[in-house]
A protein has these predicted regions:
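Conserved MFS/SLC helix-loop-helix module at the cytosolic interface between two early adjacent transmembrane helices
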Residues: 63-102, 280, 286
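A late C-terminal transmembrane helix in Major Facilitator Superfamily
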Residues: 141, 150, 325-326, 339-363
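Intracellular juxtamembrane helix-capping segments at the cytosolic ends
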Residues: 39, 117-131, 327-340
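Hydrophobic core of transmembrane alpha-helices in multi-pass small-molecule transporters
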Residues: 22, 91, 102-118, 230, ...
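Extracytoplasmic gate region of multi-pass secondary transporters
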Residues: 28-39, 214-276, 363
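Helix-loop-helix hairpin linking two adjacent transmembrane segments in secondary transporters
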Residues: 145-193
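Extracytoplasmic
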Residues: 12-47, 64-68, 153-154, 237-245, ...
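C-terminal transmembrane helical hairpin of 12-TM major facilitator-type secondary transporters
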Residues: 257, 263-275, 280-335
Length: 363
């Protein structure tokens, strides 16, 4: 009975993290590209100029992840998430006031910094501090938020573009995102380090890597993890960024069918995130991760055999690729947490995210 309030609190924290991750990822990664045609029409910029700020966004986000990880290990993750949410709100409001390309580049740099403070690393640090057991299920639920944000925010912003124009829409979206993240930080999020320290874990559930960052950097295991996750991230980003071009241009798939394939792909990704999170709680994580990688590999083989006329094979690819990609992504987060959920977890995870992001950029 004494543990009941603690259990309720950790699920309340998870609900707050879900809202934060949905808002931060939903707007920055899945929605802002909708504004590219509006920017081209308003300013007469070339496509290469419009996408330049997004490149800066990913570079800044990657480079600021290690400092953010250091802050998360030393200070309140709740406070850092709130700071990231505030910067995200300011950046989106400034986006709506943009007049020149260099201003847009500066805005995207600010958004990259904001996401490094309130994005995946900070969410996983807080989640890991609360969920010593059932971490796979909790991680799967958290990562589902990105898929929900990817479905929700483009619809909302797309409606706003038609009714109010891009400037008003992006500023209102910024205010809304700020309210969601800051409200969640105030009402739902709580730092969990002290709470988790009160729980005496059995040896089988104790973190296997609680050393310092310096100790991790001397381990072959750490570099093996980076090689595995970096390689997988290269494949995942290459798949998600280029599959639409391949299906339409190389396979000859009708553009009217692309939305259905993508809906099936991302719908299956929700199943993959939760499903592989649950499986990792019941079975050996490394074996579960191997299954997710195998599914992804089979999906890639199917992709090489696709034709525009074989609808069944096309939909099978979408399901297997969605489940395989999302399951692998979930297992990557759990792999790092299972080995390094100690006092330097934030720093170690941030370095892994930095390497993975750079590998993804190559993809």
């Amino acid at each position: 009975m004494p543990d009941a309030p603690q259990d309720r609190r950790k699920w309340s924290v998870l609900s707050g993290l879900f809202l934060v991750y949905m808002a931060s990822n939903g707007i920055t990664l899945h929605t802002l590209p909708l504004l590219y045609p509006e920017l081209i029409e308003t300013f007469g910029w070339r496509a290469s100029e419009v996408t330049l700020p997004a490149t800066i966004f990913f570079i800044v986000g990657a480079l600021t992840s290690p400092p953010a990880g250091w802050l998360l290990d030393r200070y309140s993750s709740r406070l850092i998430i709130a700071l990231g949410g505030l910067l995200l709100c300011i950046g989106l409001v400034a986006y709506g006031m943009t007049q020149t390309l260099w201003q847009l580049v500066a805005v995207y740099a600010l958004l990259g910094l904001a996401l490094s403070l309130c994005g995946l690393v900070s969410n996983m640090v807080m989640l890991t501090s609360w969920f010593a057991t059932g971490r796979g299920r909790a991680t799967g639920i958290l990562l589902m938020a990105s898929s929900l944000g990817g479905a929700l925010f483009p619809f909302i912003v797309g409606t706003g573009l038609e009714q109010s124009g891009w400037r008003t829409t992006v500023m209102l979206a910024g205010i809304g995102v700020g309210i969601v993240i800051l409200g969640s930080a105030w009402l739902l999020l709580r730092d969990g380090r002290l709470a988790s320290q009160k729980v005496a874990l059995p040896p089988s559930l104790s973190p296997r890597g609680v050393g310092s960052l310096n100790a991790a950097l001397k381990e072959r295991r750490f570099y093996a993890i980076i090689f595995i996750t970096g390689s997988l991230w290269f494949i995942i980003i290459a798949l998600t960024q280029h599959q639409s071009i391949h299906l339409a241009r190389d396979i000859g798939l009708s553009k009217t069918l692309l939305p259905a394939v993508f809906s099936l792909f991302f719908g299956s990704s929700v199943i993959g995130k939760l499903g592989f999170g649950l499986l990792s709680d019941r079975f050996d994580l490394h074996k579960v991760m191997a299954v997710s990688i195998l599914l992804l590999a089979v999906a890639l083989l199917l992709l090489a055999q696709l034709s525009a006329l074989d609808r069944a094979l096309l939909y099978l690819y979408a399901v297997m690729a969605g489940i395989g990609f999302s399951g692998t992504f979930t297992c990557i987060q759990l792999l790092v947490a299972s080995h390094y959920s100690g006092s330097h977890y934030g720093r170690i995870l941030a370095i892994v995210v930095l390497i993975d992001t750079l590998c993804g950029a190559l993809g």
